[in-house]
């Protein structure tokens, strides 16, 4: 069964589908656990209500019906598929929740003619469900509060605190000139005082 301008194929339960020739699937990308929200538009027509369907392609010429609307303005849910038709607005919504990688594949949404078992495809969807890309953990250094340090300097030295809790010290070399005592003892004492000043 065929007619001008459309391609006809049969799918599961002996139902046929038709869509414009050369139609390219729209590729949609999702991650596991996410929800697919899809809108299919059509031209509203007067007369008896025409059900709308969402099906998954199983071969180039076959498709399995997943969910079909029964009346307007009423949501129909089957498994993790939901369809809701709004004839006055000229579109119906498809929802797929809790996606898994097994949901990847080709889908069609369209107008379903139950008496002739024909669905007129409105959109051809290629759904790709893949794991979210992994990212390297971000390492941060712990925050170190600025500390204030009280420095007690021995006589002859002075301490000057600086930012970030570090300290800058200035020391004066002890006066090693003196007239009293042996020269050796004076040199030893001067060395000890100088070493102590550097350690502080």
From Swiss-Prot:
Residues of this chain annotated as glycosylated in UniProt: 93
A Pfam family reported for this protein in Swiss-Prot or TrEMBL: V-set
Single GO molecular function: signaling receptor activity
Major localization class: secreted
UniProt cross-references to PROSITE patterns, sorted A to Z: IG_LIKE
Keywords from the UniProt entry: Disulfide bond, Glycoprotein, Immunity, Immunoglobulin domain, Innate immunity, Secreted, Signal
Purpose of the protein: Positively regulates Toll-like receptor TLR7 signaling in macrophages.
Name of this protein: Trem-like transcript 4 protein
């Amino acid at each position: 069964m065929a007619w001008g301008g459309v391609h006809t194929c049969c799918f599961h339960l002996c139902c046929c589908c038709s869509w414009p020739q050369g139609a390219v699937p729209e590729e949609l990308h999702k991650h596991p656990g996410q929800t697919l929200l899809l809108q299919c538009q059509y031209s509203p027509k007067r007369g008896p209500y025409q059900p709308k369907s969402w099906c998954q392609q199983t071969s180039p010429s076959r498709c399995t019906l997943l969910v079909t609307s029964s009346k307007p303005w009423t949501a129909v849910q089957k498994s993790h598929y939901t369809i809701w038709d709004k004839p006055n607005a000229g579109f119906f919504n498809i929802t797929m929740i809790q996606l898994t990688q097994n949901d990847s594949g080709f889908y069609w949404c369209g107008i379903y003619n139950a008496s002739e078992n024909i669905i007129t495809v409105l959109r051809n969807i290629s759904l790709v469900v893949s794991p979210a890309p992994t990212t390297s953990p971000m390492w941060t250094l712990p925050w170190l509060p600025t500390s204030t340090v009280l420095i007690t300097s021995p006589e002859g030295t002075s301490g000057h605190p600086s930012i970030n809790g570090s300290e800058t010290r200035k020391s004066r070399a002890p006066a090693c000139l003196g007239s009293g005592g042996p020269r050796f003892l004076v040199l030893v004492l001067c060395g000890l005082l100088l070493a102590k000043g550097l350690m502080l």
